[in-house]
UniProtKB/Swiss-Prot annotation:
Enzyme class: ligase
Organism: Bacillus thuringiensis subsp. konkukian (strain 97-27)
Taxonomic lineage from the root: Bacteria, Bacillati, Bacillota, Bacilli, Bacillales
Record's subcellular location: Cytoplasm
Keyword set includes ATP-binding: yes
BP-aspect Gene Ontology terms: tRNA modification
Protein name: tRNA(Ile)-lysidine synthase
Amino acid sequence: MKDTFVEKVDDFVRQHDVLKERSTIVVGVSGGPDSLALLYYLLEKRAAKQFEIVVAHVDHMFRGDESHEDLQFVQDLCKGLGVICETIRINVSQYQKQYGMNAQVAARECRYAFLERIMKKYDARYVALGHHGDDQVETILMRLVRGSTPKGYAGIAVKRPFHNGYLIRPLLGVTKEEIVNYCNELKIIPRIDPSNKKEVYTRNRLRKYVLPHLKEENPQVHEKFQKFSMQMQEDEAYLQELAFEKMNKVITKKSDKQISLSIPAFESMSMPLQRRGIQLILNYLYEYKIPSSLSSIHIDKVIEFFKRTQPSGSLDFPGDLKIVRAYEECSFGFKQEIVSPFLQDLSVPGTITLSNGDKLVTEVSEDIPSDMNETVFVAKYNDISYPIRIRSRENGDRMSIQGMNGTKKIKAIFIEAKVPREKREEWPVVCDASGNIIWLPLLKRSAFAISKETAKKDKYMIIHYKSKESSGRIMK
């Protein structure tokens, strides 16, 4: 066991490959004992390790004059130490109201944005923060009590990617008591944030009532929690890699704002990979800015949603994310504007582009296409009244079906084809000038259509559905 604070931190830094020599380090300094201990430790190592050190301080303006005094304290300290000091005052309460988030999340976003800016300014390799071993214990306990993701249960990372470098926490191997003793040895008088003692916060209650009992059982309990954290992170990295590999085979469509997957393929994955697969989707869509109100409960909800017997339904998640199930497919995407009813004339010959980028193209010919698949409609030219009209569906729509007697509801056709509800509003309905529905592209042709078998030499009106995707099934 190392005897001194500096030796213990040295050992931890070496063990976890936290810092490289000849690096620029941005140190987050609040003025409290943790960040001051970190700063003085790095200053002690500066000459031997050839570190360049820049201090960064954020006044969140939560405590009025008191927090402004913290800023002045850090500035004066850095001036005396001959260290570069970058400070900023941010009205976090205003930011919090503007973006609808809790105070702690808002403060963290503002603080990290500032740290990233300073990191860029000085081309720094590291941002160093003063979290210690007791913080690690409290964080893991808090997430176990509240619920979290597997990654969350691993607690605070010693080192993780941040901007073009790393965010590091060299003090995770020491306790709060050791930090305070180190400050006392150096005769450092830190600033104390009174909010750290308010029992309204879960972390503070765990610190006051739970942590002391754990330390009675084992004074080095923080080392056990740190070992647990590292094992969890290693296991999580492996499982994340597996989940990523599996999800690439499960996802059927992907864009910046939407992901669709096959439910049967997803459910063939093991449960640990299912949970991580959902987390990967959420990370991608939220661009890693997960709303604070989102938790492991939401991931469980998605998995339960897939197991329901109802073939369709939806879930609403924070930040206007909507999860829509349609039979064996599920899409995750941000709510879009309601599709407005549309009506457009299509000349013959002519072309129109649909809202999804697909096209309807008409032509007149005495020959019918060799491939009469679902993307083609052919009728005798003189059997159709013009102009051709392309519109959105309407209540009560019915059409005659090629090869059948009577008519059938468009709604029933959509249901039988398992067309998702949100797709039905933008699906093109092709009519003639008399209002007859002559074609529902990709789904059904009307009695006006001719087949390859019944075709004779004649003048034909032909409509092609041309998808922007090669499959020809973009609507589906």
